[in-house]
């Protein structure tokens, strides 16, 4: 039987290597995942319905695992493209980039934080050989007065603007394999009641580093005075992301 060619609309030969980046205007993740699963398992899964239930999510992961076993090349490309598309739409999947540890405790700080992904460029050969360079912009809009440490003040109507330059690389030792597709059922007792935790996970190990810089003189001077001072530089050699969260975001 002639093998079907899926993902042709992506023109992956040029998609992943054109100017060293992935093109951002890609669609059809859901349709192509459905085709890859059908090719691998012989089953036609309605992803839109399956993604709404626990059993359905488990089925998507186990079926995606089978797809990776049968067609690792196209499955890899699809998972990476889902990551890129979702990240560009604001589904970051990296908790540290939300600055929750810095901003949540400061409930008396009258500001609103805006975040935007300016670009997300990926160079790719395989799961064990990829790199990402991205830039995110953050704006702190102050609607109250704030008096902080080191004589830092912010007034109503003021703004602080920052750029975050992010670099991600594949993990040097931990490889992506069929074992990276994980479904776990864990039972435990909580106040004499049996509880169950379902874990749906497509694990990708990586390392990342970023630097945070002020866009203007005021923001640059204030950066080491406010609660973001611990976020000026950040690095993690042992980081995991869940690729399934990006599929969930894109499957409608």
Curated annotation (Swiss-Prot):
Pfam families: Lipoprotein_3. It is found in: Cell membrane. Its main location: membrane. A lipid is attached at residue 26 (S-diacylglycerol cysteine). A lipid is attached at residue 26 (N-palmitoyl cysteine). Residues 1-25 form the signal peptide. This is Uncharacterized lipoprotein MPN_411. It comes from Mycoplasma pneumoniae (strain ATCC 29342 / M129 / Subtype 1) (Mycoplasmoides pneumoniae). The lineage of its organism: Bacteria, Bacillati, Mycoplasmatota, Mycoplasmoidales, Mycoplasmoidaceae.
């Amino acid at each position: 039987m002639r093998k079907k060619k899926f993902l042709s609309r992506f023109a992956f030969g040029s998609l992943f290597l054109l100017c060293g980046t992935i093109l951002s205007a890609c669609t059809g993740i859901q349709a192509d995942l459905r085709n890859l699963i059908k090719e691998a398992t012989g089953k036609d899964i309605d992803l839109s319905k399956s993604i709404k239930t626990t059993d359905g999510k488990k089925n998507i992961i186990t079926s995606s695992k089978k797809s990776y076993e049968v067609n690792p090349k196209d499955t890899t490309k699809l998972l990476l493209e889902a990551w890129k598309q979702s990240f560009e739409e604001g589904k970051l999947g990296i908790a540290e980039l939300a600055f929750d540890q810095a901003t949540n405790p400061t409930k008396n700080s009258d500001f609103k934080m805006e975040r935007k992904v300016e670009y997300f460029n990926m160079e790719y050969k395989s799961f064990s050989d990829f790199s990402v360079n991205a830039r995110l912009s953050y704006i702190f809009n102050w609607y109250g007065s704030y008096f902080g440490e080191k004589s830092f003040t912010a007034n109503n109507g003021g703004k602080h603007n920052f750029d975050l330059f992010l670099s991600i690389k594949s993990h040097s030792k931990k490889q992506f394999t069929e074992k990276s597709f994980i479904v776990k059922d864990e039972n435990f007792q909580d106040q004499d009641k049996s509880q169950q935790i379902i874990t749906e996970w497509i694990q990708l190990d990586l390392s990342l580093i970023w630097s945070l810089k002020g866009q203007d003189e005021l923001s640059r001077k204030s950066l080491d005075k406010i609660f973001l001072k611990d976020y000026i530089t950040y690095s993690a050699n042992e980081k995991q992301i869940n690729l399934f969260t990006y599929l969930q975001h894109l499957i409608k």
